[in-house]
Amino acid sequence: MNLRPLHDRVIVKRLDNETKTASGIVIPDAAAEKPDQGEVLAIGPGKKDDKGNPIALDVKVGDRVLFGKYAGQAVKVDGQELLVMREEDIMAVVTK
């Protein structure tokens, strides 16, 4: 299934957290916090200004982003859990 977000919405796939600590202790899924980083899979065309022209988003497909713990709406697509969020819910783009 293909998703095309509307307006300033962004589709993000959470990145997996480490399931083992530095000392080798395995963290069970139930105790692990949800990761606050993800990869942008799709972006909408942007909000519209007063004249109806779209305002481009700052993020692009493939960006690694930081977002709040409770940001976005979780959706399941083809067995994969994704987040649909507004661009304003994204706090930063991770650069290497």
UniProtKB/Swiss-Prot annotation:
GO terms for biological process: chaperone cofactor-dependent protein refolding. One of its GO terms (molecular function) is metal ion binding. Keywords: Chaperone, Cytoplasm. It is found in: Cytoplasm. InterPro entries: Chaperonin_GroES (IPR020818), Chaperonin_GroES_sf (IPR037124), Chaprnonin_Cpn10_CS (IPR018369), GroES-like_sf (IPR011032). PROSITE patterns: CHAPERONINS_CPN10 (PS00681). The keyword Lipoprotein does not apply. GO terms for cellular component: cytoplasm. Its main location: cytoplasm. The keyword Chaperone applies. It comes from the Bacteria. Heptamer of 7 subunits arranged in a ring. Interacts with the chaperonin GroEL. Together with the chaperonin GroEL, plays an essential role in assisting protein folding. The GroEL-GroES system forms a nano-cage that allows encapsulation of the non-native substrate proteins and provides a physical environment optimized to promote and accelerate protein folding. GroES binds to the apical surface of the GroEL ring, thereby capping the opening of the GroEL channel. Belongs to the GroES chaperonin family. HAMAP family: CH10. This is Co-chaperonin GroES.
